[in-house]
């Protein structure tokens, strides 16, 4: 199972890197809001809720939930970007980013869980 988690984490991290690289080129013009990280963490929260609700076998959940989605989402980058926004005086953006990340993550995790419970 440990190899499944590691393999899943590598897939998630590569997906995060690709989406972040693309997002920095195409979604960051004219804004200080770290949109790629926000999108990654919100979609990750949704899919984690979905995976949890599906009551997958432990090995599948370890691969998808802990591995892929754990490698895909990023708590450390989120917090680093928040510190950067604060240091650069972007308090308004910081406030909205914080709210969107945590509240949005909780809402989307709940939506994913609800959808998964219907399947």
Swiss-Prot record:
Main localization, broad class: membrane
InterPro entries: FluC
Function, as annotated: Fluoride-specific ion channel. Important for reducing fluoride concentration in the cell, thus reducing its toxicity.
Any one GO biological process: cellular detoxification of fluoride
Catalytic activity annotation: fluoride(in) = fluoride(out)
Positions annotated to bind Na(+): 70, 73
Spans traversing the lipid bilayer: 1-21, 44-64, 98-118
Metal-binding listed as a keyword: yes
Membrane topology listed for this record: Multi-pass membrane protein
A cellular component term, taken from the record's GO annotations: plasma membrane
Subcellular location: Cell membrane
An example molecular function term from Gene Ontology annotations: metal ion binding
Keywords: Cell membrane, Ion channel, Ion transport, Membrane, Metal-binding, Sodium, Transmembrane, Transmembrane helix, Transport
HAMAP family: FluC (MF_00454)
Record text on activity regulation: Na(+) is not transported, but it plays an essential structural role and its presence is essential for fluoride channel function.
Family the UniProt entry places it in: Belongs to the fluoride channel Fluc/FEX (TC 1.A.43) family.
Keyword Nucleotidyltransferase applies: no
Stated name of the protein: Fluoride-specific ion channel FluC 2
């Amino acid at each position: 199972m440990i190899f499944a988690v590691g393999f899943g984490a590598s897939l998630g991290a590569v997906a995060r890197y690709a989406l972040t690289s693309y997002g920095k080129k195409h979604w960051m013009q004219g804004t200080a809001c770290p949109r790629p990280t926000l999108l990654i963490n919100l979609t990750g929260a949704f899919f984690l809720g979905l995976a949890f609700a599906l009551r997958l076998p432990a090995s599948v959940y370890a691969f998808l939930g802990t591995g892929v989605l754990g490698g895909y989402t990023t708590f450390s980058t989120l917090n680093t970007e928040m510190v950067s926004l604060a240091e650069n005086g972007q308090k308004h953006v910081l406030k909205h980013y914080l709210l969107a990340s945590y509240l949005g993550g909780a809402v989307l995790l709940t939506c994913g869980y609800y959808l998964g419970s219907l399947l």
